[in-house]
Amino acid sequence: KRSHYIIGGLALAMSMPSCLQAQTTQPKDTTMTRTVVVEQEYNPDIMDASKVNVLPKVEEPTVSKKEVEYATTFFPATSVPAGLMRPYTGKEVQPGTTPGYVRAGYGNYGNLDILANYLFRLSQKDKLNVRFQMDGMDGKLTLPFTDSEKWNAFYYRTRANVDYTHQFNKLDLNIAGNFGLSNFNFQPESVNSKQKFTSGDFHAGIHFTDETAPLRFNAETNLLMYERQHNMFNESEANTGIKETIIRTKGDVTGAIGDQQLITIALEMNNLLYNGYTKNVSTGDEYFKNYTTLLLNPYYELDNDDWKLHIGANVDLSFGFDKSFRISPDITAQYIFSDSYIVYAKATGGKQLNDFRRLESICPYGELPEANTTATLGYVQRPYDTYEQINGSIGFKASPYPGLWFNVFGGYQNLKNDLSYLGFDPSNIHSGSYLSFAQDNTENLYLGGEISYDYKDILGISAKYTYRNWDSKTEEYLLAVKPVSEMSFNVRIHPISALNINLGYDYISRKEVKEYAKMTAINDLHIGASYNV
C-alpha cells in the first residue's frame, strides 16, 4: 500500500512541469485554444462577436422662467466703433401726379385766360412736354386826362412750347422749341395804330447730372428769332419790319476740389444779326449793325457748415457795337451761426442784352429810339446794352422761432445805359403821341426787409417792403417810371389737403420828377381759391 503512494507521488511530480509550460507558452491560435483561454479570463473581450450597449433612461431637462432685466442706465459714448453698421433707408418714391392740366377763364373787358399743358412719359428716360397759353383783353377803356374818351383796346398774347428730355446715365439731353405772338393796338392819336411781335426759338443742350463727379460740364446752343412789324413813326410806310436773329452758345466746366470746394468757368457767346428796315436806302447809313458779345464768368465756391462763398468776376467783351470791354464783380459771402442766423454780403453785376425780347418785357408799347440826326428822320436804331456795374448789398437773416423768418438788407446799384421810356406829345415833327425807349446812367440806394411765418403747412403769412432812392446824372425825367416804394403782403390758408385760399396785396409808387410828371401808384388787391378734386 505504501508502494502505491510512492508511485502516485512520482506520477504527480512528473506531470507538474507540463502544466506550467501550458500556462506560460501559448500554442498556435486555434479555435480550441481560444476557447480555453477565454474561459480562463475574467470579464473577457470576445472578438468577432456583437455587443449590445444598454444606456440608462435620461430625463429631459426643464428650464425655469425668470424675469428679463434690461439695462436702462445711460453711458456717454467716448468713441464710435469703426465698423458701425449704417441705418437702412428706404428708396423715396414720389407720388404719382396728373400729367395734364387745363385752365380756361373769361372776364370783363374781354379778359381771356387759356392754358393747357400735358406731359407725355414716353418711357422711364424720355419725357415730352407740350404747352399752349393764350391771354389778353378786348374792351373799351377810359382814357386819362380826357372827358371820358374811350379807347377800344385789345392785347392778345399766344405762346406754344414743346420740350423733350432724354436721360442718359450721367447726362440729360434737352431739345425744345418755342413760339410767341403778340397783337395789340395803341391809344387814339398815336403815331402808329397797331403792332405785332412774332418770336420763335430752338434750343438743344446737354446737362451733366452726376453731382459727385470730380469734373462735370453743361453745354447748349440756341437759335432765337424775333420780328417787330412796325418800326417807323408812320405805319403807312411799307416794309418797316425789323428781324432780329440771335445765335447763343453757352457752356460751363466745373472741377471739384474735395467735397466742399469747386472751380467753374462759364462762357456765353451771342451773335446778333439784323435785317429788314435797318438802314437808310438813300444814304446807306446803317442803324442796326451785326455784332458779337462774349461773356466770361470764372468763379470759386466754398460750401461747408458755416461758410458759403462764391468769388468770381464777370468779364464782358463786345465786337462791332457798344463798349468793347467791361468787368464787374461776382461775389457772395454768407456766414451761418447757431443754425438759424445768417449774415451775408454780395456784389454782382454784368451785361443785360437789350434785345427785342427785353424791350417787350419792359414796355411793349415803346417805340425804338430815333436815329440821332435830322437827316435820318423816321429811322430808328437799336438801344445800347445795359451794364450793371455793381449791385452790392449786406443783410441779416434770422429764425428766432420755428417757422418764423425775417430778413433786413440794404445796398447800392449802379447801371450804365439804364433802359427806360418816356412819353412824347404830338408836335410839328410827329403828328401823334408815342412812347419811346431812352437811356441814361442811373444809380440808387435801397433799404428793405421781409418777414414770413409758416404754421404746419396750414397757414402762411409773408410781407416785404423795399425803398429806393434814384438818381440820374443828365436825364432825370427818365426816373419817372422808376419804383420808389414796393410793398407786398400775402396770406396762404390750407385748411384741408384739397383746399387752398390765397389773399394778396401789391403796392408800387413811382418817383416824382419835378416839372415833369408823377405816375399814379399801382394798387393790386387779389384773392383766390382752388380745390383739387
Identify what each model region corresponds to:
Residues M137-L141, E149-R159, L173-R216, N222-I246:
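Flexible loop and strand-edge segments within Gram-negative outer membrane beta-barrel domains
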Residues L20-E92:
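N-terminal periplasmic/intermembrane-space "pro-region" immediately following the signal or transit peptide
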Residues L122-T142, T264-L272, Y277, Y287-S318, ...:
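Surface-exposed extracellular loop regions of Gram-negative outer-membrane beta-barrel proteins
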Residues P81-L84, V93-V102, Y106-F145, N152-A160, ...:
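Outer-membrane beta-barrel translocator/receptor signature
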Residues A116-F120, A160-H166, F202-D210, T249-G255, ...:
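Residues on the lipid-exposed face of transmembrane beta-strands in outer-membrane beta-barrel proteins
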Residues T97, V102, K308, D316-G320, ...:
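Exposed, low-structure sequence patches enriched in small/polar residues
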Residues Y106-N108, M134-D138, F168-K170, F179-N185, ...:
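Transmembrane beta-strands of outer-membrane beta-barrel pores
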